[in-house]
Amino acid sequence: MCIRVSSKGMIIGMNRLGEAFSANRAFVPEMLMAARCMSAATELLKPLMVGEGTEPVGRVCLGTVKGDMHDIGKNLVRIMMEGSGIEVFDLGVDTSAEQFVSTAVENHCGVIACSSLLTTTMEEMREVVKLVHERGPQDQIKVMVGRAPISQSFCDEIGADYYAEDAGAAAREAVAILKAQKAS
């Protein structure tokens, strides 16, 4: 029953709102309000979902890069991802490349999702990509980047695997990545 409430109601609603946000038909206040509702509902349902055999789509390691203390966008991404059935390891703000990679490796995360609001901290994303290539199983861990100053060209320049323009796109892309990883 709880899975049906989540998958047939809450997740569909958040996905539709994410699509509206991507198309500039919904705005940050609506996203924040829906995110708070989703978070509260998820917390209420969690105890009831234990034992229902819910298997997450996959795991994502999420955080704001070192030097950046902004978390509103990251929190929206977390809620959208959780609402899409992803298990999220939220590292918070000011997260080093080492923290991202070690958490992803230890917890078998298929995606590292990095956020940066400041142009002065964007370069830390390059360090995350570099460390994944040095230490992580790069065929198993994909790096996604996003937030206001980030673009597809920056993503390509630093060698990240995916760029997400907003929270809805991040959740949709992560689901697609994780499902493809499970299928292979």
What label would you give each PLM region?
Residues 163-164:
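A structural signal for hydrophobic residues in beta-strands of small regulatory alpha/beta folds
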Residues 8-73, 80:
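Long amphipathic N-terminal alpha/beta scaffold segment
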Residues 6-9, 120:
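A generic short alpha-helical patch detector that favors 3-5-residue windows
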Residues 171-184:
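A charged, well-structured terminal subsegment
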Residues 31, 77-84, 89-160, 169, ...:
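Cofactor-cradling patches in redox/metallo enzymes
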Residues 1-3:
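Short, small-residue-biased leader/transition segments that mark boundaries at the very start
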